[in-house]
Amino acid sequence: MNKLTVRNFIVGLLIVFSLNSFSSPPSISNSSSNSIDENSPINTFKISPDNQTSKKSDLATEEPKGCKYWLSLFKPVCHRLHQVWTEGHTDLYLSGYAWHNRFTYSAERIREKKYNELAWGGGLGKGFFDEKGNWHGLYAFAFLDSHRNVEPTAGYAYLRVANITKEFKAGLGFSVLVTARPDIFHNIPFPGAVPWAGIFYKKLSVKAAYIPGSSTNGNVLYVVGTYSFDK
């Protein structure tokens, strides 16, 4: 009887021990599984926007196809022109005034020659503010010149811009262009470069170019207004 009691006692201990040993792993596995879920490599792998951003930046830094054949010295210029064309806002150009410098043109001469100062015209362009806040523009438009002939022009302009207020900006710079006039080279297109200035307010801007010259030609302040459309 004593042997049976001892045997039963030992068997009972073994059963209790075995139950404890089998019941404890689930809690361990749950905690371990939770820790695995929290620190699993899958979660860290999901932080892939960095990889996507790097891929996008790689794509953004890819050389435009049109710049592939440019000399390395001029490739930055090509990249900037491509950026203005692809990322810039579309600008509507409205031309309206050309002031003949009264210090080189007398009032009598202006009356005699009947110089036109209402330089009506218009066209389209692209405008872009770079990472420093300076403005780059591509444009093509036509207007009535001093003799009321239609003068086409196309070019690139750059303005170093200062922020006067949040919405109001002003800039100074230059423009390189190609134009054609019947009184100069008989309408054969020729290049030129002129100083530019501009003021910006929201989507509106007024830009002016001074065309140097002599007492019989040039010395004209040309003014054009632009409106920028949303992309």
UniProtKB/Swiss-Prot annotation:
The gene is pagP. Residues 1-23 form the signal peptide. One of its GO terms (cellular component) is cell outer membrane. The keyword Membrane applies. GO terms for biological process: lipid A biosynthetic process. GO terms for molecular function: acyltransferase activity. It holds the Pfam family PagP. Residues 24-59 are annotated as: Disordered. The active site is at 100, 145, 146. Residues 24-43 have a biased composition (Low complexity). It catalyses: a lipid A + a 1,2-diacyl-sn-glycero-3-phosphocholine = a hepta-acyl lipid A + a 2-acyl-sn-glycero-3-phosphocholine; a lipid IVA + a 1,2-diacyl-sn-glycero-3-phosphocholine = a lipid IVB + a 2-acyl-sn-glycero-3-phosphocholine; a lipid IIA + a 1,2-diacyl-sn-glycero-3-phosphocholine = a lipid IIB + a 2-acyl-sn-glycero-3-phosphocholine. InterPro entries: LipidA_acyl_PagP, OMP/PagP_b-brl. Gene3D superfamilies: 2.40.160.20. Keywords: Acyltransferase, Cell outer membrane, Membrane, Signal, Transferase. This is Lipid A acyltransferase PagP. It is found in: Cell outer membrane. Its EC number is 2.3.1.251.
